[in-house]
């Protein structure tokens, strides 16, 4: 019989799940959430939107196709921890360079396996997301990694989870945004679009480039004047982690540029547009995370299966003067999934049309963005209005 090093997951509500260590040996704390995707664990781990969170994968067996550098969504994992019913110690994939555990050890991802993930997910769906701690016995008791944690030790970790800072009200983007602007290399000249990086995924940049956009990625704190000085044809507000409410600098930028540039927002970018227009956001009970969320397009009547990762949503009824109208809704719970400005070429979706991982039903939105840019430029004769430059002091 193979002996396994012990580990626990301690939640702030006092629940303790006992399992086995996997990945980097240590301790970690974060907000515990779950993702229903069957594949794509590497993309999930390296998505900056998961910064500050411990992710539970509902699919029971994870890791059997290893890790391929081409599937990274950023330059490193951003998850605080990873949870699965069972991780695979072996892998089979001609594209892979290493096993999932070797990848976790390389980047310091603390994980746990062997717990009842179905029970954990039911707990999160019923009671909402909670803070939690993963602790490895080998980290605290290297002399006896196979022993059990005592009840007193478990309560220490429960208290540590309770004491951990909430994601609510905390600006998580400053930990993931690019420190300096950069241009994404493309094979052809296209429409110059400024991408505000709140935690952008590589695949989003690639999809924009594929439809004829020259992406210029800028830090989250970039001012409207700095953006307009780049003479862009459009503006893109990216995905990112955490609560959108504290990002007042981003709300201000989005508000000042609204109507001056065709604008497309995804995920956190969608929420920022809602707040910029005077609306409100709210934290969801357990959010939407997975590659199988049904969304209805209210403009066409079509249903799209979408990839999602968000714990906050926009209350469109709170946006004054009907500035935005709903374009997409979630068929599971009726929450807003997309909106468009009633007067300006500004639109956004709460989900991820680039997928990675997930279905490709909504990739048409990138083409729509180019169409909005072309129409705006044709109507105004220039990608940058003289009036806008004067308004911003450029």
From Swiss-Prot:
Q: In which pathway does it act?
A: Amino-acid biosynthesis; L-arginine biosynthesis; carbamoyl phosphate from bicarbonate: step 1/1; Pyrimidine metabolism; UMP biosynthesis via de novo pathway; (S)-dihydroorotate from bicarbonate: step 1/3
Catalytic reactions of this protein: hydrogencarbonate + L-glutamine + 2 ATP + H2O = carbamoyl phosphate + L-glutamate + 2 ADP + phosphate + 2 H(+)
User: Which biological process terms from the Gene Ontology are attached to this UniProt entry?
Assistant: 'de novo' pyrimidine nucleobase biosynthetic process; 'de novo' UMP biosynthetic process; glutamine metabolic process; L-arginine biosynthetic process
**Sample GO molecular function, one term:** ATP binding
Domain spans labelled Glutamine amidotransferase type-1:
192-379
User: Its Enzyme Commission number?
Assistant: 6.3.5.5
Enumerate the UniProt keywords alphabetically.
Answer: Amino-acid biosynthesis, Arginine biosynthesis, ATP-binding, Glutamine amidotransferase, Ligase, Nucleotide-binding, Pyrimidine biosynthesis
Q: Kindly give the SUPFAM superfamilies that the UniProt entry links to this protein.
A: Carbamoyl phosphate synthetase, small subunit N-terminal domain (SSF52021), Class I glutamine amidotransferase-like (SSF52317)
- Which InterPro entries does the protein's record reference? Anth_synth/Amidotransfase, CarbamoylP_synth_ssu, CarbamoylP_synth_ssu_N, CarbP_synth_ssu_N_sf, Class_I_gatase-like, CPSase_GATase1, GATASE
Binding-site residues, L-glutamine: 49, 240, 242, 268, 271, 309, 311-312
Catalytic residues of the enzyme: 267 (nucleophile), 352, 354
> How is the subunit organization of this protein annotated in UniProt?
Composed of two chains; the small (or glutamine) chain promotes the hydrolysis of glutamine to ammonia, which is used by the large (or ammonia) chain to synthesize carbamoyl phosphate. Tetramer of heterodimers (alpha,beta)4.
Q: What is the protein's given name?
A: Carbamoyl phosphate synthase small chain
What organism is listed for this UniProt entry?
Deinococcus geothermalis (strain DSM 11300 / CIP 105573 / AG-3a)
Q: Which gene encodes it?
A: carA
